[in-house]
Amino acid sequence: MEASGIRKIVKRLIRKTGTNNPFEICKNLGIYIEYKDLGNVLGFFKYNRRQKFIFINNRLCLMMAKQVCAHELGHVTLHPCVNTVFLDICTYAVTEKFENEANKFAAELLISNEDILENKEKSIEAIACLLEVSKNLVEFKMEGLYANPNLIKNHSYFNER
């Protein structure tokens, strides 16, 4: 799915739930969040008997747990019938496309266009630190943002100069 399609889905979800907090969105949508010791796995999504579950490694700090929740919410929203843990472990199918889409979803959910554009002079690391997200998430957001010049051109930050 294109970044613009993911952006539209995220905007609708934020409008519907009134928040960009992935934990609150899950609560509003009836998605259960479970914290477990998952070893090296950060998290995963499971659909079981019409119930949706997001499992998050209980060893993660709040910042990482929030990102993992946003990423897994991306799977819930974009790939509700695909069990990527099953695909990875049992079938060795290539899941890179699904993972990239879930990362783009998380970036769109947790980082606004304004967050990037108003801090464009700063390094990726500085923006990540300021927003309390990973550097990779900032890179995903920037990739999607700069792929659509209209988002930049129409932003008030650039029109005021």
PLM region descriptions:
Residues 1-161:
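Active-site hotspot residues in diverse enzymes, especially metal/ion-binding acidic/histidine motifs
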